Amino acid sequence: MRRTGLSLAEVAPAVGDDQVCAEQLLRRHLRELDVELTWRSALRDRLADALASARDPDHHAAVPVLMEVIRTMVLQQDYVHGYHAQEGHRLNDQAQTLADLLHADTRFPAGSRVLELGCGVGAQSVELLARNPGIELTCIDTSAESLRTAGGRLERNKTAPVRLVQADLYDLPAAEGLLKSASFDHVVICFVLEHLNAPDDALDRARRLLRSGGTLTVIEGDHGSTAFHPDSRAAHAAIDCLVRLQRAAGGDPDIGRRLYPLLSTAGFRDVRVTPRQVYVDGSHPDLAEGFVRRTFTAMVAGVRTPALAAGLSTAEDFDAGIADLLLTAEADGVFSYTFYKAVAVAA
């Protein structure tokens, strides 16, 4: 069943004698694949249009191919990884693999009003609810498709009721209603600031959504912290494709190292930042599979199409880089990556 593209977490409940459960799982997966094919077809059309426009001498004064591709179709509403089923599986694998490392100390009292900004497909939402029973969780995201996926995931995990709201962070706080100023005790942001062109503005809005004395929790990665053995120029070049696309979109793939100054400047007090290193070697085959193969390498591999379209790499070079990244997950390989977790108090 893993060969169909299902994640480990999805396959596990269907292994056994329950053929009905397995059939339901596969039928749902088939529907997700249909969505994936539709997305890829649309992506192909956008790419063709972008390349045609870039070659038109009357269009944007013959803008360079790279920038036209980025402007027209690569960024998928400024989210460099895209909104599709495979990305949803990657985010879910990431959340499960890193749950204890990132969320072991994420604790909110029962009855707390908690807001998750940019919940995506709900991968982190499930963890927040599992570790904090009794909280009143509200999740917002700009993508209706992601919210539908999040709703399904939360339902399958039989979590407590959650408010899922389609909203743009930059439109908050609202003048009235659920998302008005000072409405929450705690705000959580996971892997969102790295994609924003104005993270300082986003943090200011998060602060205004909190009551005085409420807390903000932010978790972000830092691609510049990546180190591995065997070392490989091709692997570094493939990672650099992701980094360059993200920066071209206005994001910051190394934002983890900037959390302390960002939160301090945004008006938070008692800012505490801790590094959370993922270290993988032959003694951690679970992390080699869950993080190196299914999270980090899958993330880099996910930008293959836009990277080639933008002329950042050739198919041969990019694929060689992915192959070399996978070597670091073998028994004699080593991989290291650092996340940063910040907790602060709203003044």
Region roles according to the model:
Residues V80, R272-G333:
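C-terminal helical/coil "lid" or tail adjacent to the Rossmann-like core of SAM-dependent
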Residues D93-G111, E127:
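Conserved alpha-helix/loop element of class I SAM-dependent methyltransferases that forms part
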Residues D200-T215:
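A short glycine-rich, Lys/Arg-flanked "PGG" loop and its adjoining helix->strand segment in the class I
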Residues Q76-Q96:
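Class I SAM-dependent methyltransferase Rossmann-like catalytic core
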Residues A174-V187:
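A short acidic, Gly/Pro-enriched loop at the edge of an enzyme's catalytic core
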Residues V15-R71:
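Short, charged amphipathic alpha-helical surface segments
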Residues T217-P285, R294:
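Conserved catalytic/acceptor-binding region of the Class I
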